[in-house]
């Protein structure tokens, strides 16, 4: 072991090993696919509580709602939605 070495394998040695690519050939596409499905099915909207793109405005409106009172914003928006 060289002086000052932490005992870890060099990065180049890791990424050129077959074991690294066998593991990552499965995990990287799986992570991408899981993220794609999470967003495309709409589960991301439900998990984070954000409105879906078609729920930002009512059908009769064409601009964003303006809140005039800082601490009464939720009640103002609730009144608009009814």
From Swiss-Prot:
Its main location: membrane. With its partner (PsbF) binds heme. PSII binds additional chlorophylls, carotenoids and specific lipids. It is a single-pass membrane protein. It is found in: Cellular thylakoid membrane. The chain crosses the membrane at residues 22-36. Heterodimer of an alpha subunit and a beta subunit. PSII is composed of 1 copy each of membrane proteins PsbA, PsbB, PsbC, PsbD, PsbE, PsbF, PsbH, PsbI, PsbJ, PsbK, PsbL, PsbM, PsbT, PsbX, PsbY, PsbZ, Psb30/Ycf12, peripheral proteins PsbO, CyanoQ (PsbQ), PsbU, PsbV and a large number of cofactors. It forms dimeric complexes. GO terms for cellular component: photosystem II; plasma membrane-derived thylakoid membrane. PANTHER family: CYTOCHROME B559 SUBUNIT BETA-RELATED. Its cofactor is heme b. InterPro entries: PSII_cyt_b559_asu (IPR006217), PSII_cyt_b559_asu_sf (IPR037025), PSII_cyt_b559_N (IPR013081), PSII_cytb559_asu_lum (IPR013082). It holds the Pfam family Cytochrom_B559. Heme binds at residue 24. This b-type cytochrome is tightly associated with the reaction center of photosystem II (PSII). PSII is a light-driven water:plastoquinone oxidoreductase that uses light energy to abstract electrons from H(2)O, generating O(2) and a proton gradient subsequently used for ATP formation. It consists of a core antenna complex that captures photons, and an electron transfer chain that converts photonic excitation into a charge separation. SUPFAM superfamilies: Cytochrome b559 subunits (SSF161045). This is Cytochrome b559 subunit alpha. GO terms for molecular function: electron transfer activity; heme binding; iron ion binding. One of its GO terms (biological process) is photosynthetic electron transport chain. It comes from Synechococcus sp. (strain WH7803). Belongs to the PsbE/PsbF family. Keywords: Electron transport, Heme, Iron, Membrane, Metal-binding, Photosynthesis, Photosystem II, Thylakoid, Transmembrane, Transmembrane helix, Transport.
